[in-house]
Design a protein with these regions (language model features):
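Receiver (REC) domain active-site loop signature in two-component systems and cognate sites
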Residues: 29
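Helix N-cap/capping motif at the beta->alpha junctions
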Residues: 3-12, 34-36
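Active-site T/S-Asp motif of two-component receiver
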Residues: 24-26, 37
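Active-site beta3 strand of CheY-like receiver
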Residues: 18-24
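As written
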Residues: 34, 66-72
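C-terminal output helix
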Residues: 61, 79-89
Length: 96
């Protein structure tokens, strides 16, 4: 598990390290939001890394924007740990 505190740090990690198997990201982050970070990450990785959004933002515009980015999953906070586990299992069982 690699923890990045903001979108810029996550992109820096992707530029200089082996790609992770999964990115779990909030939409509302400092410096660069999760949507912008995902767009840039997809350019860096060719969209090869599934992104699971875990966020308190549940308005229709945000959800649809994440879907257009081909988000692998979307969990609204607050959540139970079993939701994360279930989504990660689902993603890894069917991701490309």
């Amino acid at each position: 598990v690699i923890l990045c505190k903001c979108g810029k740090q996550a992109l820096h990690y992707l530029e200089h390290n082996e790609f992770p198997d999964l990115i779990i990201m909030d939409v509302d982050m400092p410096e660069m939001n999760g949507i912008e970070t995902t767009m840039r990450a997809n350019k860096l990785t060719g969209g090869r890394i599934p992104v699971l959004f875990v966020t308190a933002m549940c308005d229709a515009h945000t959800v649809m924007t994440c879907r257009r980015l081909h988000a692998a999953g979307y969990i609204v906070r607050p959540y139970k740990a079993i939701y994360i586990k279930s989504e990660v299992e689902r993603i890894f069982s069917g991701w490309r």
